[in-house]
Each structure stands twice: as structure tokens, then as C-alpha cells.
Amino acid sequence: MFWIKKVVSQVIMPVPFILLLLLLSLFIWRKPRLAKWAIASAFTLLLLLSSQFSVDYLVKPLETQYPINTTPIADTCVVMVLGSAHSDIEGATAVQSLSAVALARLTEGLRQLKLGQDCSLVVSGWGGELTQHPHAEVMAKAAVELGIDASRIIEFPLARDTLEEAHYFKESFGNQPVRLVTSASHMPRAMAIFSGKGLTASAAPTDFRARDDFYWRFTADNLLASQRALHEYIGRLWLWVKQE
């Protein structure tokens, strides 16, 4: 089920879907009306999703649900940074191996640690099929490189998605409150998942992608932000279907 979800979600993402429409137009070139419809749909999607319009109506509603968190953490302190991605780069440090998203999340996680006393840092993520080391391990090494004592770090190297991250947290910490760090667009779904597990999480969003810009500008950054937002809406739909 995990792999089916991954494959389906990737196919219906904007860039693969646009490419599929263009490919379809090649196969149906003997039917000019359908071919023109496929090409027009592909370019319309590309223009809309790379525009400021898409950012305003898809991305901002997700990223504005939880504000930047500067509240001190009282009592027992656990900060959990949800996983993202890294690459195996020969000779690179752990910090240099992290994706931009992972580094943004880890940096926010370290900021949140300073808001509490003797906080534990939880990092998560498996290695997938393309890397030699679990993402949690690389995140932990990066945190140490950035000055965090290794004894404060707990790894969940088997967690493949947010559902499993919440599962492993509950297994390890029970109902202990957690300061949850993830990308701003992902935060609403992450909070819904943790709440669904009966966990008390306070949101610490980072990696904000919605930026104000001119409506006539079409950028790859807008397209990436729109793709992330659509991924989240599809994820929420999947979560709703599973709960029914």
C-alpha cells in the first residue's frame, strides 16, 4: 500500500501529469481535436501552477494555518523534526548532504531546542532505495556537526512517512507533548496525523514557500511550491479516505 500511494501520488503531480498530457497528444495526433485539447490543457496547467495566482490560492492557505513558533517549551521537552531527503555525496559533511528542505527543518529544530531546557531532539526518516544510510542517521550527524550533543538525539530510522513517524513517536514517548517541526505547507497534515494518534503536538513550521510577487511572473519556484501544495491536498484526501 505504501508503494502504491507513492506511485499514484507522483503520477498525478503537476510536472509528471503535464508530461503525460503532452505524451498523450503524440499518441492521438490522428485525432486533432483531442490532441489540441491535451496540449492546451498541459500548457494551461503549466502557466497556472507556475504563477503567483497558484501560490496565493494553493500554497498560502496551507502555510498560514500555523504561525512561526517562539513560545518557550515548559516541562519535559521533546522536539521532533520530520524527515525529508538527503544525497550520498562523496566527501561531503552530513550538513552538506541534506536537501534544502531537510536543512531548513533541522535548523528550525535546533532553534526550538533553545526554547526549552535539556530538550531531546527526535529525527526520523528511512534510507529508501537510493541512499546508503537512513535519513534519520544523516540528520543526527548533521545536528552533531551543528553543535548538538549526540546523547540528546533519538533516531527513528524506519519511519517512511508521517503516519509512521507519528506511530514511532507514540511507541517511544506515549502521549508526551512534542514540539513538531516540518515544512509550513506540510504542517496541517502532520498536525492532523499526530492529533489522530492522540498526541499533543505544538506546531513549529519552517521552509515557507509562499512569496508575494508580480502576477505576470511565471517561475520554477512557484511551480515547485504549487506541486508541494497539491501533494498535501492529495495527502489529506488519502488520510480522509483511510479514516472512513
Where are the model-predicted features located?
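Alpha-helical transmembrane anchor segments
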Residues: I12, P16-F17, L47-L48, W216, ...
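C-terminal capping/extension of enzyme domains
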Residues: Y215-E244
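Hydrophobic alpha-helical transmembrane segments
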Residues: L20-L21, W37-A40, A229
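Hydrophobic alpha-helical segments of integral membrane proteins
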Residues: W3-V8, S54, L58-L62, L230-L237
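Membrane-interface helix-boundary motifs at transmembrane edges
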Residues: I28-K36
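Hydrophobic membrane-insertion alpha-helices, especially the h-region
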Residues: W37-Q52
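A structural signal for short, hydrophobic/glycine-enriched beta-strand patches
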Residues: Q52-N222
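Membrane-embedded alpha-helical segments of integral membrane proteins
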Residues: M1-I28
